[in-house]
From Swiss-Prot:
The keyword DNA-binding is annotated on this UniProt entry: no
InterPro entries registered for this protein in UniProt: UPF0756_TM
Transmembrane residue ranges: 10-32, 51-71, 88-108, 127-147
Family: Belongs to the UPF0756 family.
Subcellular location: Cell membrane
Protein name as catalogued: UPF0756 membrane protein Dd1591_2981
UniProt keyword annotations, A-Z: Cell membrane, Membrane, Transmembrane, Transmembrane helix
Membrane topology label: Multi-pass membrane protein
PANTHER family given in the database record: UPF0756 MEMBRANE PROTEIN YEAL
Species whose genome carries this gene: Dickeya chrysanthemi (strain Ech1591) (Dickeya zeae (strain Ech1591))
Superkingdom classification of source: Bacteria
GO cellular component, one term: plasma membrane
Tagged with keyword Transmembrane: yes
HAMAP family tied to this protein: UPF0756 (MF_01874)
């Protein structure tokens, strides 16, 4: 890493976008990556790149499943989700989005040239529109439908 590090500048610009939009999730995530980049911890980037997404999905899944595990959502509530049309729609959409995410993983693996655009778009969506950073996989899945890959 030299005196002029364009990657660091991009990260700092994205962190500034997170600060301006008052999105602490984006800001903290990017500042964490900046800290890793400028310290000896940077040799962990291959590990973060390889396992970071899986770890993030694990944490997200824990957060989503916590109401069932805690009893806030009862077994009866889960079973009744197959009896109401809104819940059936939620199940169908969950299946569709999971399928799109799977296509997205394949596209991102096979065509790494699209990853930068997906990531920048996701960070912008999170920072500007209060989205959540699950966008790259779904965006890649949608892109795969448009370009016929995945």
């Amino acid at each position: 890493m030299g005196v002029f590090d364009p990657t660091l500048l991009i990260l700092l610009a994205l962190a500034a976008l997170g600060i301006i939009s008052q999105n602490m999730t984006v800001t903290l995530a990017i500042l964490f990556l900046v800290a890793v980049r400028i310290t000896p911890l940077n040799h962990y980037f291959p590990w973060v790149e390889k396992y970071g997404l899986s770890f993030g999905v694990l944490v997200l899944t824990i957060g989503v499943m916590a109401p069932i595990a805690s009893g806030k959502i009862s077994a009866g509530d889960v079973l009744s989700s197959f009896l109401h049309w809104k819940s059936l729609m939620a199940v169908a959409i969950g299946v569709a989005v999971s399928w799109l995410g799977g296509r997205g993983v394949v596209l991102m693996s096979n065509q790494p040239s699209v990853v930068a655009g997906l990531l920048v778009g996701t960070v912008m969506g999170v920072a500007l529109f209060r989205g959540v950073p699950v966008g790259p996989l779904i965006a890649a899945g949608l892109l795969s439908l448009l370009i016929g890959k995945g």
